[in-house]
């Protein structure tokens, strides 16, 4: 008997989990298929979640009603706020995960989710009828019919592990690869690229000499990614810092001919921002040393991840490298590092909803779209799940703009510009990063999460209370006038500020660079009455008000361009005077509006002006296909 679902999700990694949960929570009957149920939410590379830009994505997923933040809050072994000495736009949370606990907690959540079935099975083929996906077929011939399919296959598509001169078919961590589905996608006409990533060796904690390394503790205050988290893990495990040296580099130099990276065995493009140790040695050979972080993989294992030592060198060379590193001279290697090549689709073949242009109701999310990182995958996953469910249920799709979220930046970059290497999200990619902060992810996206049915009534009530408290406190400080008495002058001078000549509104005093919210309370002789997150918002919104308003003005200009819609079926060959490169790129990307068209590489301002003229004169409707 053929089983029927609204949505089928292929894969149960970080993209698949968020896609499946979002789809089910929106009310779609959802099936998640995975090669091995024991590897749900597996972390094949680094045992961490978050970091610059990525940590903000985790907060955004949480604000939309996703799961990653809640799970890492329950299962981390260490948490740190990064870039605390810099402005709020680049601050981000990073957590070290207990990999096994993280998997177990995610599996528990999935198994207890209404509307979601989980099944072990390898999908070999998509069922396509009239350029529309109708379901999937597994390697044992089982058919699952559905109204939409989301592919979240990670690095499994035609995966090959490479170690020295050894190369064999495999998914990450020596799991089964997905070869037949990869061939199926090629047969369906998708433009496929070959990418590469890698992982470092793991060593036994009992054999590390930590006295030769530098301790890297977590923060000693409770931190969390999720708005819902109220209990914090304070019993944390440290990481440790060590370095490569001249001896390490000599081992690499002597054996560079054995590296798959430089022997020609690896054809795929690797990640620019996470290079192998061989790559670092060659590209930055003026550097006398490179940082290595020793990261525990969990509370109940001795495996330690050697962050920064990703390699495809043979196993015996990896051992030689470890012997040269302070603290690791006698370390037992428990797993060798390796490189992995895999298939990815060219992401300009997608609409901003992550639906494929060629096949209706087929969505893709995660590393199959050319990205790297658990967080980037999860961010795409939740949007693919939201949109697939909204599509089949008729409840509407959502596209996050570049000013809404880092997830919006990520997806727009992929579908508009494409990528010729594994894409990593960076704060520098976001032109509105002062608006897209770690601290305001809930304020930006909780309303949307609630409208989509992914945020509970109880949580939404708490969120609205927080939002009102921020508004009320800013208004209160706007109404309170501080007198220039000796008490006030002494505190201001102690903070390095200049004495007041006249009275001043509390809100204006807070805008001074040397002032903070706590100092204002001290001047007013008041105690802390509000939650820390509310006080933080009051301070940031006040101090950066001018810059924030400038960014908002820029956003309004772009929104006016986004309002100028372009028909999906426009025939650009019939638009006179467009440059040939612009005509080709516009036909490939099929931008939905003038703003997106302006971001396409190869489309210049003159081409945009021509499109605007056609749009304003109503000519675009006449050149549709």
Swiss-Prot record:
GO biological process terms on file: tRNA methylation; tRNA wobble uridine modification
Subcellular location: Cytoplasm
Cofactor list: FAD
Keywords attached to this entry: Cytoplasm, FAD, Flavoprotein, NAD, tRNA processing
Main localization category: cytoplasm
Record-level Gene Ontology MF annotations: flavin adenine dinucleotide binding
Residues that, per the record, bind FAD: 11-16, 123, 178, 367
Source taxon at top rank: Bacteria
Record text on subunit structure and interactions: Homodimer. Heterotetramer of two MnmE and two MnmG subunits.
Described function: NAD-binding protein involved in the addition of a carboxymethylaminomethyl (cmnm) group at the wobble position (U34) of certain tRNAs, forming tRNA-cmnm(5)s(2)U34.
Protein name: tRNA uridine 5-carboxymethylaminomethyl modification enzyme MnmG
Native species: Staphylococcus epidermidis (strain ATCC 35984 / DSM 28319 / BCRC 17069 / CCUG 31568 / BM 3577 / RP62A)
Lineage: Bacteria, Bacillati, Bacillota, Bacilli, Bacillales
Gene name, Swiss-Prot/TrEMBL: mnmG
């Amino acid at each position: 008997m053929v089983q029927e679902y609204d949505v089928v999700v292929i894969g149960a990694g970080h993209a698949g989990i968020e896609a499946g949960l979002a789809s089910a929570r929106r009310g779609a009957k959802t099936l998640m298929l995975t090669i091995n149920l024991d590897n749900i939410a597996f972390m094949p590379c680094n045992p961490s979640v978050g970091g610059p830009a990525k940590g903000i994505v985790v907060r955004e997923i949480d604000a939309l009603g996703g799961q990653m933040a809640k799970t890492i809050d329950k299962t981390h072994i260490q948490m740190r706020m990064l870039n605390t000495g810099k402005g709020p736009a680049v601050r981000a949370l990073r957590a070290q995960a207990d990999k096994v606990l993280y998997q177990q907690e995610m599996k528990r959540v999935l198994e207890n989710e209404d509307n979601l079935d989980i099944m072990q099975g390898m999908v070999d083929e998509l069922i396509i009828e009239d350029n529309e996906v109708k379901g999937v077929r597994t390697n044992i011939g089982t058919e699952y019919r559905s109204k939409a399919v989301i592919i979240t296959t990670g690095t499994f598509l035609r995966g090959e592990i490479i170690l020295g001169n050894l190369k064999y078919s495999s998914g990450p961590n020596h799991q089964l690869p997905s070869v037949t589905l990869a061939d199926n996608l090629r047969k369906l006409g998708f433009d496929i690229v070959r990418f590469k990533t890698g992982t470092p060796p793991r060593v036994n904690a009992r054999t590390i000499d930590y006295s030769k390394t530098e301790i890297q503790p977590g923060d000693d205050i409770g931190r969390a990614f999720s708005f819902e988290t109220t209990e914090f893990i304070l019993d944390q495990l440290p990481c440790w810092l060590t370095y490569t040296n001249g001896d390490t580099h000599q081992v690499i130099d002597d054996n560079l001919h054995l590296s798959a990276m430089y022997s020609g065995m690896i054809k795929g493009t690797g990640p620019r921002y996470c290079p192998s140790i061989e790559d670092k040695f060659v590209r930055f050979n003026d550097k006398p040393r490179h940082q290595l972080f020793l990261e525990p993989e969990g509370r109940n294992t001795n495996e330690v991840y050697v962050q920064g030592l990703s390699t495809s060198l043979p196993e015996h060379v990896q051992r030689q490298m470890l012997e040269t590193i302070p603290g690791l001279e006698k370390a037992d290697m428990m797993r060798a590092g390796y490189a992995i090549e895999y298939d990815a689709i060219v992401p300009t073949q997608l609409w901003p909803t992550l639906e494929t242009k060629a096949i209706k109701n087929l969505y893709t999310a995660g590393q199959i779209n050319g990205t790297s990182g658990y967080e980037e995958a999860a961010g795409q996953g939740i949007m693919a799940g939201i949109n697939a469910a909204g599509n089949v249920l008729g409840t509407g799709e959502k596209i996050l703009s570049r000013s809404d979220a880092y997830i919006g930046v990520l997806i727009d970059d992929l579908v508009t510009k494409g990528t010729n290497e594994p894409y990593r999200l960076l704060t520098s990619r976001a032109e509105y990063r002062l608006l897209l902060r770690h601290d305001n992810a809930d304020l930006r996206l909780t309303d949307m999460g609630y409208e989509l049915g992914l945020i509970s009534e109880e949580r939404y009530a708490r969120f609205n209370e927080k939002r009102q408290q921020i508004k009320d406190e800013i208004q209160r400080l706007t109404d309170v006038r501080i007198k220039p008495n000796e008490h006030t002058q002494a505190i201001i001078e102690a903070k390095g500020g200049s004495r007041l000549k006249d009275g001043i509104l509390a809100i204006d005093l807070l805008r001074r660079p040397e002032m903070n919210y706590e100092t204002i309370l001290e001047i007013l002789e008041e105690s802390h009455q509000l939650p820390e997150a509310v006080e933080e918002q009051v301070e940031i919104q006040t101090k950066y008000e001018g810059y924030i308003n400038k960014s908002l003005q820029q956003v309004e200009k772009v929104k006016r361009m986004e309002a100028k819609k372009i028909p999906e079926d426009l025939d650009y060959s019939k638009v006179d005077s467009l440059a040939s490169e612009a005509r080709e790129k516009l036909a490939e990307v099929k931008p939905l509006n003038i703003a997106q068209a302006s971001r396409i590489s190869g489309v210049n301002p003159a081409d945009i002006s021509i499109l605007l003229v056609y749009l304003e004169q109503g000519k675009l409707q006449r050149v549709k296909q």
